[in-house]
A protein has these predicted regions:
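Alpha-helical transmembrane segments in multipass membrane proteins, preferentially the mid-helix core
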Residues: 124-130, 173-179, 222-234, 304-318
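Hydrophobic alpha-helical transmembrane segments in multi-pass integral membrane proteins
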Residues: 256-262, 336-348
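Membrane-cytosol interface segments of multi-pass membrane proteins
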Residues: 1-196, 317, 323, 327-330, ...
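C-terminal ends of transmembrane alpha-helices
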Residues: 33-38, 99, 197-211, 254-271
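Alpha-helical transmembrane segments of multi-pass integral membrane proteins
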Residues: 24, 30, 90-94, 192-197, ...
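Alpha-helical transmembrane segments and terminal signal-anchor/GPI-anchor hydrophobic tails
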Residues: 236-322, 327
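Loop-centered beta-sheet repeat module
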Residues: 193-234
Length: 397
């Protein structure tokens, strides 16, 4: 019976989508690891990272929306939202813990290779042990949740969402929005989201408060994925003419954006991430300021074409990327901790002095991290930790 079930699951699984998610999560890891090289003013690293940041999160969010269609049919919607909130708290506090450890005076100055390896091993073992206790003992689960929530409220600014955990908070907003607008015409909701995203930056950004700025800027991509049917998606990426044109566009975009990465980089925050207001454009002239919403909409359109170029290039069959694509949450969360381990361990100091080779070395390490954390072991570990059981709230008295 189990073999038959597994066989059916294998046949019905969309490996093309898994491969797309696999490539996107590798790009997420690459983008984060290249950020430190960018801070070291490597021109090539800036170009490559700018190209990745041009489309990787819009693509990741598009696929999140595309795969979220079953949310409205779920009986326990609150459980889904709370699992994202819980992962957000774990993620945020986990990053704070890593910084707390390595910012101790003991780690200042000299190299501590042995200590670093020991801490990394203990950190990995601790996550596994925590997942076992959390999943097997309800009393421990409830106590741990209470402890983390209390600590988050008392010791950290839980409403200020920065760095990688913002994605978890954004998913909560997106699922709430699709639920609240489920009876509205899809084209109207999508158009409203585009208009709001295009005009929002005339005001000073809300900043990191509940990740509202980024949520607004990326909302059109989630809705586009959520509303797009599988038939329409496959028609676009598999149509011979469109597939060829979009693939060429993706390759040309990679070349143009990478070459002009330093010039493009400073405007991504204005048009995409919602971290800079349109008033920043005034130094270029009033005309640029007044047409900013149109520029933002054009930016979205170009990004969508680049995305579908990537989708068209992705393999359709079962590859190692498909496994990574199935286990994206574990990779997304765990690689962020190891980025800090690499920084504190002096990884960037041993890279080649040649900026091109240094970027290649960083990409290779990014791929290795994605493969390591994309294993079934870590997928099961993270799945156990992400569960928040609230079904008792739905029980009839």
């Amino acid at each position: 019976m189990n073999q038959q079930t597994a066989s059916v699951a294998t046949k019905t699984r969309d490996y093309h989508v898994d491969n797309i998610k696999g490539i996107l999560i590798i790009l997420v890891v690459c983008g984060h690891l290249l950020s430190y090289l960018q801070d070291m003013n490597s021109t090539f690293a800036i170009g490559v990272r700018t190209f990745i940041y041009f489309f990787h999160m819009p693509g990741f969010i598009f696929m999140s929306g595309y795969l979220a269609k079953g949310f409205l049919k779920k009986e326990y919607k609150g459980e889904k939202l709370l699992s994202y909130a819980w992962l957000y708290l774990l993620f945020k506090n986990g990053i704070d813990l890593v910084h707390f450890i390595f910012r101790r005076p003991y780690f200042a100055g000299n190299s501590h290779t042995i200590e670093l390896i020991l801490i990394v091993c203990l950190f990995c073992f601790g996550i596994w042990l925590l997942s076992q206790l959390y999943s097997r003992f309800p009393a421990f689960q409830n106590g741990f949740i209470l402890l983390v929530v209390l600590y988050s409220v008392l010791k950290t600014n839980v409403l200020t969402v920065g760095a990688a955990p913002w994605y978890m908070m954004a998913l909560i907003w997106y699922h709430i929005i699709v639920y609240l607008t489920k009876n509205m015409k899809q084209s109207h909701v999508l158009a409203a989201a585009v208009i709001i995203a295009a005009f929002a930056n005339y005001q000073d950004p809300i900043g990191k408060f509940l990740t509202l700025s980024r949520m607004i800027n990326f909302l059109p991509f989630f809705l586009l994925g959520f509303y797009m049917t599988r038939e329409r998606f496959e028609t676009i990426v598999n149509h011979p003419k469109w597939k060829y044109l979009l693939s060429i566009l993706f390759i040309l975009s990679a070349f143009v954006i990478t070459i002009n990465g330093r010039a493009i980089k400073k405007w991504i925050g204005v048009f995409f991430f919602g971290v800079s207001p349109y008033s920043k454009l005034l130094k270029l002239g009033d005309w640029y300021y007044h047409i900013a919403p149109l520029t933002c909409i054009l930016w979205m359109a170009v990004t969508i074409m680049i995305l579908f170029g990537l989708f068209a290039l992705c393999p359709r069959g079962k590859t190692f990327l498909a496994k990574l694509g199935r286990n994206t949450i574990g990779i997304y969360v765990l690689h962020r901790f190891f980025k800090d381990f690499l920084i504190y361990g002096g990884f960037y100091g041993v890279l080649s002095q040649n900026e091109y080779i240094a970027v290649i070395e960083t990409i290779v390490v990014s791929l290795l991290l994605a493969i390591a954390f994309g294993t079934d072991f870590w997928a099961k570990t993270m799945n156990k930790l992400s569960v928040v059981n609230v079904k008792w709230l739905y029980k009839k008295v």
